[in-house]
From Swiss-Prot:
InterPro entries given in the database record: Mur-like_cat_sf (IPR036565), Mur_ligase_C (IPR004101), Mur_ligase_C_dom_sf (IPR036615), Mur_ligase_cen (IPR013221), Mur_ligase_N (IPR000713), MurCDEF_pg_biosynth (IPR050061), UDP-N-AcMur_Ala_ligase_MurC (IPR005758)
Molecular-function GO term, any one: UDP-N-acetylmuramate-L-alanine ligase activity
Origin superkingdom: Bacteria
Native organism: Anaeromyxobacter sp. (strain K)
Protein name: UDP-N-acetylmuramate--L-alanine ligase
Binding site for ATP: G115, S116, H117, G118, K119, T120, T121
Pfam families (UniProt xref): Mur_ligase (PF01225), Mur_ligase_C (PF02875), Mur_ligase_M (PF08245)
Keyword Cell cycle: yes
Assigned protein family: Belongs to the MurCDEF family.
Catalytic activity of the protein: UDP-N-acetyl-alpha-D-muramate + L-alanine + ATP = UDP-N-acetyl-alpha-D-muramoyl-L-alanine + ADP + phosphate + H(+)
Cell compartments where the protein resides: Cytoplasm
Gene from which the chain derives: murC
């Protein structure tokens, strides 16, 4: 323990280029620890960590862990990884990323945001609010925050704002002082097995809050509302519901912004604006308004913070415009996220929407096939490409072709299956001036936007 507290520990990350791992590594580097890491390929993230003083290796090899005190892994790292095997052979502790994150949080008051969707945006907004209020928080986010130029920020204040990952249950390792839950949908059932087990996991997460802490819960979501009787700590709710402690009314969607009136029970807090698309982002902002109010931050400061929020990369990010076509990129890959993003795009821009969607993981495609079948109703044209495996093995029946058939069977009139290598060219043939093109998915479909723009500019 003294080794870690004195910042003499040598910490190695396997898969350091991952969005969850790199943020923790960056904070540790800025705190003065010796940090090394390995990844399969070079990226902007690994180059940034190397520039901060990290020793980065490409490829996984036993020699990478010979001089380290602890090895940090994510759930994506296989048990037979040579660095993990060598560390265990040498009796070097091998810990999940959440355990290292929890160790950092013990030094601060932790604000942890969890939920099936919206947690990256909400975490980023919360960190921005605390920074704007002069609290100088540390933050670890699951996406690159435009204002930080990174997915992490080391602050000198007493607060740490983190995105809590429920996918493998690791969020039960972290100790939040304030816990926010945005929603709970059936997801990651390869780990949780049943929706009820997932729901119980969120109950346990919220109840990790200390007696002096707080839970902030979205009452609009039925599963979140269902955990209220099981919450043992002080809790406030938010949403459009008239039963919410913090309520949003008169939501207005206009271009790249959402505006709404916020109330604390029946007391008006004012009209707020955030430069994000979609009704769901009004609720994400409302969670942050509730956080600020409960922390004693004046509503005027919160209003200014939300108005100046610059967003997160791959959350309805405009990639460019060419030949009268606007190209937008978004990380949404769950049916609820897809539906909300497409609905927000149509409501805000009132243009023809061409969606380029890449399913993410065979398990998700299999488990949520029916939900995906109705998620694309707000896309005039859907170009569906190959499943991004994310390390999974193929599953019989869980194919892009079967998904395309399901979407057509549920009534969509314009669905085309396109190989990933041909996606940009296929899109060029379908778009026309005035269209909004939306690349959607957590895989490499993000590159299809710039590819399309290059073709349109010729």
């Amino acid at each position: 323990m003294s080794l870690f507290r004195s910042r003499q520990a040598k910490i190695h990350f396997v898969g350091v280029g991952g969005i969850g791992m790199s943020g923790i590594a960056e904070v540790l580097l800025n705190l003065g620890y010796t940090v090394s890491g390995s990844d399969l390929r070079e990226s902007e993230t690994t180059r940034r960590l190397a520039g901060l003083g990290g020793r980065i290796s490409y490829g996984h090899a036993a020699e990478n862990v010979l001089q380290v005190d602890v090895v940090v892994i994510s759930s994506a790292v296989k048990r037979d990884n040579p660095e993990v095997l060598e560390a265990r052979r040498r009796k070097i502790p091998v810990i999940p990323r959440a355990e290292m994150l929890a160790e950092l949080m013990r030094l601060k008051y932790g604000v942890a945001i969890a939920g099936s969707h919206g947690k990256t945006t909400t975490t980023s907004m919360a960190a921005h609010l605390l920074a704007h209020a002069g609290l100088d928080p540390t933050a670890v986010v699951g996406g690159k925050v435009n204002a930080f130029g990174s997915n992490a920020k080391l602050g000198k204040g007493d607060y740490m704002v983190v995105e809590a990952d429920e996918s493998d249950g690791s969020f039960l390792r972290i100790p939040p002082t304030i816990a926010i839950v945005t929603n709970i949908d059936p997801e990651h059932l390869d780990h949780w097995k049943t929706p009820d087990a997932l729901r119980r996991g969120f109950v346990d997460f919220v109840n990790r809050v200390p007696f002096y802490g707080l839970a902030i819960l979205c009452i609009d979501h039925p599963t979140v509302q269902s955990i209220l009787p099981d919450v043992e700590k002080r809790a406030v709710t938010y949403g459009e519901s008239h039963q919410a402690d913090y309520r949003a009314e008169a939501i207005e969607l206009s271009g790249h912004a959402v505006r709404f009136d916020a109330f604390r029970r029946d007391e008006a807090l004012g009209r707020f604006e955030v430069a994000m698309v979609g009704r769901h982002n009004a609720l994400n902002a409302l969670a942050v308004i509730a956080l600020g109010d409960e922390m004693g931050i004046p509503p005027l400061v919160t209003r200014e913070a939300l108005r100046s929020f610059q967003g997160v990369q791959r959350r309805f990010t405009v990639r460019g415009e060419a030949a009268g076509v606007t190209v937008v990129d978004d990380y949404g890959h769950h049916p609820a996220e897809v539906k909300a993003t497409l609905q927000g795009a149509r409501e805000a821009f009132k243009r023809r929407v061409v969606c380029l969607f890449q399913p993410h993981r065979y398990t998700r495609t299999r488990d949520l096939m029916a939900e995906f079948a109705t998620a694309f109703n707000d896309a005039d044209v859907l170009l569906l490409t190959d499943i991004y495996a994310a390390g999974e093995e193929p599953i019989p029946g869980a194919t892009a072709a079967n998904l395309a058939d399901a979407i057509r069977a549920w009534g969509h009139r314009d669905v085309t299956l396109v190989p990933r290598a041909e996606l940009a060219r296929a899109a060029r043939e379908r778009v026309r001036p005035g269209d909004l093109v939306l690349t959607l998915g957590a895989g490499d479909v993000t590159a299809a936007g710039p590819e399309l723009l290059a073709l349109l500019e010729r």
